[in-house]
Amino acid sequence: MDPYKYRPSSAYNTPFCTTNSGAPIWNNTAVMSVGERGPILLEDYQLIEKIATFTRERIPERVVHRRGASAKGFFEVTHDISNLTCADFLRAPGVQTPVIVRFSTVIHERGSPETLRDPRGFAVKFYTREGNFDLVGNNFPVFFVRDAMQFPDVIRAFKPNPKSHLQEPWRYLDFCSYHPESLLSFAWFYDDVGIPINYRHMEGFGVQAYSLINKSGKARLVKFHWKPTCGVKSMMEEEAIRIGGTNHSHATQDLYESIAAGNFPEWRLYIQTIDYEDQNKYDFEPLDTTITWPEDVVPLQPVGRLVLNKNIDNFFAENEMLAFSMSLVPGIHYSDDKMLQARSFAYADTQRHRLGPNYLQLPVNAPKCPHHNNHHEGFMNFMHRDEEVNYFPSRYDPCRHAEKFPMPPNVLTGKRERCVIPKENNNFKQAGDRYRSWAPDRQDRFVKRFVEALSDPRVTDEVRNIWISYWSQADRSLGQKIASRLNVRPNI
């Protein structure tokens, strides 16, 4: 008998219970002991295995995006962008690619209410014919900091106090007071969209600028946008308190039940593109993740649609073990965006920590196309490889290099040094523009929320004055409103 022919596939493929090694169990309700009232015997392997498995069934939580829900479906190209990219899954209208999507809250812990104010994750894994493409983003188009060196710090600032394990506004207001570029992110965070009504009515953004490369090797910067066809909807604090008090998983439940009922969620994918040679023509830095590309300057272009039409079969196998690692395919590449380049390491590294070095062998993470390399063995390797050559090149193995795909030369010059993005951006303009675009009642709600955060007793007068100064530079009336409600005289 070929032992590799019979691989574990289902927990229910025998009519009776077995041990992990397959031995039949005739009693799964009582321990082995010395008589009815005697002690348990160490030889009760069945009990030891059951308890040992139980105490090890949890894996490390994600460091961020711990609370999440997943669903499966497809992406279909609706508009021809073959002039922009040679990516196979975007080659022509009508092409469909299977996907799995994970929605999440960013900061809060696994099991926390989905009604808390928090950015949401929007991650899509495309199982293409040329490998997996992971597009990992959020429901905000911007991030709080622009340099990757500060990424761990901003996450820690938003997470609970390490002494009390309480999430306190003074911590992130203190940290971000050193980062005026965070203003636009706060204009999203404390806006109505800070609490989406569910995942189906939520936008998604790639946040960072990627590169699209076409067949001739021409490269363009690109940003990705997901727009829900059912519209964007959010909930106010009162509704969030009411729903969160009765159901911590309302968004997960809504997603699951909608798909089960045949009400399939759908999003449209749009892109913005900038020619590499045109990067310096704009009054904003295209590689800065703390600002957006104005749509009146860089218009949206439609690409395709994302449809989620199948629920996952097992939450642990297809949500907890689902791993996004910024995977790329020919025709899509990283840009010089510093946050993106750091994420390309961080995402894969955290999956190796959570799931082990062979996390890409797990069915939910493995590519659906043929794949081959000499990365083998290591913890939890379960791929049977009948081979004698595990190196490259070799005259005994027909494996060869693939056909080279277009990759433009990128000539770089500069000193090796630690420095910020050189172009001086206006940290306040887009935040002010966003605030002024709201109706008066929406503006008032934003002011109320930010004033409540600044009213944390641990927030010092110095920090309050810094934030009043920042918001005054974004919009003078906004700064005055915040100062008035705090009974503080603005300095600007």
From Swiss-Prot:
Family in the record: Belongs to the catalase family.
Protein's GO biological process: hydrogen peroxide catabolic process; response to hydrogen peroxide
InterPro entries: Catalase, Catalase_AS, Catalase_clade1/3, Catalase_core, Catalase_haem_BS, Catalase_immune_responsive, Catalase_sf
Subunit text: Homotetramer.
Annotated keywords: Heme, Hydrogen peroxide, Iron, Metal-binding, Oxidoreductase, Peroxidase, Peroxisome
Coiled coil regions in record: none
Identification of the protein by name: Catalase isozyme 3
EC number: 1.11.1.6
Pfam families (UniProt xref): Catalase (PF00199), Catalase-rel (PF06628)
